[in-house]
Design a protein with these regions (language model features):
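Generic short beta-strand segments
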Residues: 102-106, 127-129, 212-215
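C-terminal regulatory/effector modules of DNA-binding transcriptional regulators
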Residues: 117-118, 135, 146-239
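HTH-adjacent hinge/linker in prokaryotic transcriptional regulators
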Residues: 2-8, 34-35, 42-122, 149-161, ...
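Catalytic-core "active-site belt" of small-molecule-metabolizing enzymes
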Residues: 108-120, 125, 129-143
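A short alpha-helical element within helix-turn-helix/winged-helix DNA-binding domains
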Residues: 18, 23-36
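Short helix->loop/beta-hairpin flanking segments within DNA-binding domains
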Residues: 6-24
Length: 239
């Protein structure tokens, strides 16, 4: 039987291929249920994934439509694909440092939307700086819901996990982890990010950085939101 992940993939492909364009109406829950022969809950779960990826939006009185596309879709192989495929955490000459794990209240609108939480809800944040041949290239920030951390104990203390968290989560729970579409956008770097990337810029100078993000789900909803902040000119890992 088709599941929510397959339904999300079907519509994601239609949106990215241009078969569905910004402003186009999505099938109603009932229409999509009939189309795929599934119950309404499965369709809602699939639509929630697409909403978390910024691909569709729901508005009172207007139903669900395809969203505008300010983000760039990242294609090809990324660090997570490499880890799943080869078991290698790092590419040649790559490592990471500054691993930290902390409990915090979430206020970032993008994180709250992706994880379907309210501003101020408690999350677990894992931070590390990736380096290529000793030079910082990106800051990795992973935001986890508390239920995720309960199942993946390797998040404790140093924040180093033995393997991909999705595999660990599946081993502990039996639930499959679905990785959403990775997208990118530009924004201004925080001072902490400037320091971690060792950018030599005058104090208080605005620095534009490329930010990629992806959200993970299981059958019960969002699990984690991962963000990588790249130094200007840095190459996104693709092997």
């Amino acid at each position: 039987m088709i599941g929510y992940a397959e339904i999300a993939t079907h519509f994601r492909r239609q949106i990215t291929d241009g078969e569905l364009n910004p402003g186009d109406a999505m099938p109603s829950y009932t229409e999509a249920s009939d189309q795929f022969g599934v119950n309404r809950t499965t369709v809602i779960r699939a639509y929630d994934i697409l909403k978390s990826e910024g691909l569709i939006v729901s508005r009172p009185g207007k139903g669900t439509t395809v969203a505008a596309r300010p983000s760039i879709v990242i294609s090809g192989v990324d660090r997570l694909d490499r880890l799943s495929r080869t078991g290698r955490r790092y590419g040649p000459g790559e490592d990471s440092t500054g691993h930290r794990v902390m409990w915090r209240s979430a206020y970032d609108a993008e994180v709250c939307r992706a994880l379907e939480i309210e501003p101020g809800d408690e999350v677990v944040i894992r931070i590390r700086t990736f380096r290529q041949d000793g030079q910082p290239t990106s800051v990795g920030v992973s935001v986890y819901l508390p239920r995720t951390v309960t199942e993946v104990q390797e998040l404790a203390e140093e924040g180093r996990m033995q393997g991909y968290f999705g595999d660990l989560y599946t081993e502990r729970t039996g639930r499959e982890v679905t990785k959403g579409q990775r997208t990118a956008r530009a924004r201004q770097a925080s001072q902490d990010e400037i320091d971690a990337l060792q950018l030599n810029v005058p104090a208080h100078m605005a620095v534009a950085v490329l930010v990629t993000n992806v959200t993970f789900h299981d059958e019960d909803g969002p699990l984690a939101y991962w963000e990588d902040v790249y130094a200007p000119g840095a190459k996104i890992p693709t092997a």
